[in-house]
Swiss-Prot record:
Its EC number is 1.-.-.-. This is R2-like ligand binding oxidase. One of its GO terms (molecular function) is metal ion binding. Binds 1 Fe cation per subunit. Fe cation binds at residues 101, 167, 202, 205. Belongs to the ribonucleoside diphosphate reductase small chain family. R2-like ligand binding oxidase subfamily. Probable oxidase that might be involved in lipid metabolism. There is a cross-link at residues 71-162 (3-(O4'-tyrosyl)-valine (Val-Tyr)). GO terms for biological process: deoxyribonucleotide biosynthetic process.
Amino acid sequence: MARTRSDSLAAGGLNWDSLPLRLFAGGNAKFWDPADIDFSRDRADWESLTDLERDWATRLCAEFIAGEEAVTQDIQPFMAAMRAEGRLGDEMYLTQFAFEEAKHTQVFRMWLDAVGITEDLQGYLDELPAYCQMFYEELPASLDALATDPSPAAQVRASVTYNHVIEGMMALTGYYAWHRICVDRGILPGMQELVRRIGDDERRHMAWGTFTCRRHVAADDANWAVFETRMNELIPLALRNTEDGFALYDEVPFGLTMEEFQQYAADKGMRRFGTISSARGRPLAEIDVDYSPLHLEDTFADEDRKSLAASA
């Protein structure tokens, strides 16, 4: 694509109050280095777990690291779509987004190495058909589509797939599982720190996805139907992934139940509809500086903290 001008030189400069650049500034302010996390106690805690507990937790970690790797590879077309749309602020934020996904891949791999898990883990995912469909089919297809079709509808479908369902349901449910494993037992402090750091990054990622869907719905109400349709296609698949995981175990460790996690995931998915629908008919200028997408993710985080504290 030939370049004819530089947006950063435009009169008035960049709108630092726009949500994408607010997220970008937030990521800069909260930068963290995986090498600074202390995993030294995690090895002893890991070895104190039963074989069943280690197997369940290894599968959970395998799902996370493979997901982080997938997004690191697949997010590039969204950057190109933002460039095609002339949205420098979004493109700047997505460069940070991609860097953070690569960093998340790094830190999960560092944790696996620290606790001594070096064998091939692909088999843990091969037993999860819904997971494989989501990450090996739905995610790359929806994001790759942006390379040839960067339209608002295609952006909404891609954002729903990753930001709303994969991050907004599946990943949040996985973080909840790690909290239940680690905090309830007072173990794996390195993993606790890892999850806290990643969760903070991904709240910004989800907020950007919500913002992107909101601005497209505000601009054209037809995109609301695109959002609804894609959510209704993928929510059952996300819930089926939880079923697949629990079905592999005659005995589930750590006192976890499928019903608890299904309810948690479904709640996070369904509450996203209201945030997107509230943008219908709104002026685009308002959407650009409306921070409700970030407030929603902060609300979810606060609810989790209170719930986990009450159950401790």
